[in-house]
């Protein structure tokens, strides 16, 4: 009888999890691995495809409006293009490079010691080069429309101050990077084995939602590679005048999201001091 009671009272086993060890600041061993260069290629190609599809969508929308045709995809469609492409590309590249596709995401993961400094820097280079090539392809395919319709470049819209634009970029990037941390949290993955498969969905949806809020202000940066690619290929004064906002804002937002997730939600600083024991039911 006691045996039956003890069996009935047993709880289903809880999946254990362990945080991966922090990446070393300088991991030169990565430079000898083919998987490292494969990841760089994946980031380059993913960012190229991201910029090609999204900037082509922006230019197509503006062309239809300028020609007094139907309104095209509209701002909602543009937001879906950005969010949908992130969903697709993160799904395709997460197992190869982590699916960053954004220097701000890479910075946030570096600050959380998820990637080494060498990997972070070279990822950013690959992302920026991919963005430039992707926008260049758009210009090559639709040169007249590209040059006459703003080139998909991020600028501070009329009626908004640079301070407002900076704040919008900080908050928008915070939402994105915070979502990345939450969707890829190893503790969440340990509880539910299907979470890693679904991780691209909330990340893409976060990009979609942030675009809805920020397109009227800056055209939505939250990705310095996206902003740089369009600015380099369009190469006009206004995008360059506002360009610093599209680096400072996303990087500050990424830093804030990394600090919030690691030191508030995960209590990393307190755990390191040995004065806090996390509740396994959390």
From Swiss-Prot:
Residues that span the membrane, as ranges: 39-59, 72-92, 121-141, 163-183, 197-217, 245-265
Source organism per UniProt: Musa acuminata (Banana)
Domain notes: Aquaporins contain two tandem repeats each containing three membrane-spanning domains and a pore-forming loop with the signature motif Asn-Pro-Ala (NPA).
Classification via SUPFAM superfamilies: Aquaporin-like
GO molecular function term, any single one: channel activity
All ranges on the Extracellular side of the membrane: 60-71, 142-162, 218-244
Domain of life: Eukaryota
Family, per entry: Belongs to the MIP/aquaporin (TC 1.A.8) family. PIP (TC 1.A.8.11) subfamily.
Protein name: Aquaporin PIP2-7
Topology term for the membrane: Multi-pass membrane protein
Main location per the UniProt record: membrane
